[in-house]
Amino acid sequence: MNCFQEKQFSRENLLKMPFRMVLTGGSGSGKTIYLLSLFSTLVKKYKHIFLFTPVYNPDYDGYIWPNHINFVSSQESLEYNLIRTKSNIEKCIAVAQNHKKSAHFLLIFDDVGDKLSKCNTLIEFLNFGRHLNTSIILLCQTYRHVPILGRANITHFCSFNISISDAENMLRSMPVKGKRKDILNMLNMIQTARSNNRLAIIIEDSVFCEGELRICTDTADKDVIEQKLNIDILVNQYSHMKKNLNAILESKKTKLCNSDQSSSSKNVSS
């Protein structure tokens, strides 16, 4: 008998302790839009947020300071930028400790691909980053991009309409409460029954699940989907670029306006 229950995901639980989250799904499945919906919660604790991505993604405008975005087009550039970021984190922690304060960091890797599975510094962060008050979020199109040597430390597995076989492979190393067979049956049941293609189905590890046999679900926020700017998300993060906040927000508004005009033109022509 499957004793698992479906529950609404509590985003506030992500603030309790460092986490390692994997968001897996195909292109256009809703991974990024859901991640952006988590920001209003995450910035309550994580004041230093860094993004690693191979190409510029305008979706992150207004969510992450430009000087905290690292473009990593090769294995070497990913390794280099991570080593440099780790050094900066260690310096920030030392300064915070001198002032009897704590600093918390979040590293996001968006569609970096198979470079993730070969990155030694990322594996170190997955396995030992808790000691640096660092949490990790990986956005991947397939579980294969999650480093094998770091899968045992994944705390949250977020499925966006992926195959059950892929979910099974991901869960093999992840420490979960209950039988994996029951988890997979429940996952399949929810994916089949819920018509929302962008539904996030979240499996927590044995610590974050709070002793419950549960699978959580969540959806992106309406304001994020409608691209409504929330200035507090940037304001609550540390950056040397805060003095340029107005210019950054104006740039974001201009891009949104141009996008809307382009969409309107297409509708008229069609």
From Swiss-Prot:
Pfam families tied to this protein: Pox_A32
Annotated transmembrane regions: none
Keywords: ATP-binding, Nucleotide-binding
Binding-site residues, ATP: 55-62
GO terms, molecular function: ATP binding
Function: Participates in viral DNA packaging and virion morphogenesis.
Subunit structure, interactors included: Interacts with protein OPG137.
Protein family per UniProt: Belongs to the orthopoxvirus OPG160 protein family.
Protein name: DNA packaging protein OPG160
Origin species: Vaccinia virus (strain Copenhagen)
